[in-house]
C-alpha cells in the first residue's frame, strides 16, 4: 500500500507507508493534462444507474461489508422508557450486566470540575496508565487504554489480521469477536464449548494445527454463562502457535487473580479489562489492555490518537481513587448473585448455571419459550437478555442487580407458575 501524490506533473509519486524511504515511480499515463487540469481516464468499479447516469452510493462500500449483519446492542433507559411507556425508575434493567450502583461519588465531583474539556485529551493517557500500573502491579509501558475494551478488540484485529486470515471463536461467548472479525474481513472458525461450557482444548489444538488461525479470543469469566478458564487450559493454549486474547471484563467478580502480569512472560498473550462493570462507567467507555512490549508498539502506531475522552480519563482516575467503594460494590453484587441463583433454582421452568460473574445464565425448560418469557417480562418493566443464536435460543441471561431488583424480578416470575 502507498500514498499517491498527484501534483502538476504527468506522473504519480507513490510514497510507501511501510518504509521511511520515499519511493516513487512513473505510471503509464492514466490521465491527460489539459491546461493544468488533471482528468482521470482510469475505469471505475462503481455501480451506475444507467437510466439516470448516477453512481450509486453503496457501490463505494467494501463488498464484504454489504452482507454484514448489524450488531444487536442493548437499549439504554431513555429508549426503553419511550418504548415501554414507563419512567426509567420504573424499569428494572437486568439485561446488560451493568453496575446498578454506579461509580464512586468522586467521579461525579471530578466530572463537574473538569478544567480543560475544550482541549484534546492526552493521546497516551499517561495519568490513567500510571494509576492502572499502581492498581494492577504491571508497569505502565505494558498498558494501553481504549474507548472501551470493544475498541481494543477491533484495534487488535486491525493490527494482526490480513483480510481472509482466521480467528478461533468458542461459542457461546461474547459476540463482539465474530462481529469485529466480519468488519475486518477475517474468517471465523467456531470451536464450540463443552456442555458444561468449558473449553474443548483438544479440538482447539487440532484447529490450530490444521487451519493455522492467527488468534483466539477467550473470555474469563465467560459471557454469557459465567464460567472461568482453568489455569491448566490457558497454559495449554498459550503453548500453541496462536495469539491469545484473554478478555477479563468480569474478572473482579470471580475471586480469580487477573493474568495481566502474564504478558511479561508470554509473547502471545493479550489481556483486556474494562471500567464498565467494576467501576460503573459503561456509559463513558473506558477499557484497557495489557500487551507484550513487542506487540504494544504497533498498537500505539495504529490507534486513533485521541481515542479516550477527557471525561472518560477523568472519571476513570476518580474511580480508582476510591478502592474501598469499588470493593464494597463488588462484594454486594457477588452476594446478590448468590442470592439470585438460589431464588432462580426454585422457579420450576428455569435451570440456572453457577456463575463467577455478575450475571446468571438460565435454561428455560418445561416447554416455556425463552424469547416469549423475555418479552413478557419486558411488558412488566423487567429487562433480561435473550439470544437469537442457535446455541442459546432456549436461554435467558439475568444480571445481578440490587436486592430490590431481584425482588421485583421474582414477583414477576411467580406470575408464570
Curated annotation (Swiss-Prot):
Pathways per UniProt: Amino-acid biosynthesis; L-histidine biosynthesis; L-histidine from 5-phospho-alpha-D-ribose 1-diphosphate: step 7/9
Origin superkingdom:
Eukaryota
EC main group: transferase
What GO molecular function annotations does the UniProt record carry, in alphabetical order?
A: histidinol-phosphate transaminase activity; pyridoxal phosphate binding
> Where does the record say this protein resides?
Plastid, Chloroplast
Which reaction is catalysed here?
Answer: L-histidinol phosphate + 2-oxoglutarate = 3-(imidazol-4-yl)-2-oxopropyl phosphate + L-glutamate
- Pfam families per the record? Aminotran_1_2
- Residue numbers of N-acetylalanine PTMs: 41
Among InterPro entries, the record links this protein to: Aminotransferase_I/II_large, HisP_aminotrans, PyrdxlP-dep_Trfase, PyrdxlP-dep_Trfase_major, PyrdxlP-dep_Trfase_small
Q: Which cofactor does it need?
A: pyridoxal 5'-phosphate
User: Residue range of the transit peptide?
Assistant: 1-40
Q: Which UniProt keywords apply?
A: Acetylation, Amino-acid biosynthesis, Aminotransferase, Chloroplast, Histidine biosynthesis, Plastid, Pyridoxal phosphate, Transferase, Transit peptide
Tissue-specificity statement: Expressed in both vegetative and reproductive tissues.
| Xref: CDD domains | AAT_like (cd00609)
Question: Which terms under GO biological process does the entry name?
Answer: L-histidine biosynthetic process
* One term under GO cellular component: chloroplast
Q: N6-(pyridoxal phosphate)lysine (modified residue): where?
A: 277
Instruction: Name the EC number(s).
Output: 2.6.1.9
Major subcellular location class: plastid
Q: Which PANTHER family match?
A: HISTIDINOL-PHOSPHATE AMINOTRANSFERASE (PTHR42885:SF2), HISTIDINOL-PHOSPHATE AMINOTRANSFERASE-RELATED (PTHR42885)
Q: Which NCBIfam families match?
A: hisC
According to the record's subunit comment, the protein's assembly and interactions are: Homodimer.
Family (UniProt): Belongs to the class-II pyridoxal-phosphate-dependent aminotransferase family. Histidinol-phosphate aminotransferase subfamily.
Q: HAMAP family this protein is in?
A: HisC_aminotrans_2
Tell me the protein's name.
Histidinol-phosphate aminotransferase 1, chloroplastic
Tell me which species this is from. Answer: Arabidopsis thaliana (Mouse-ear cress)
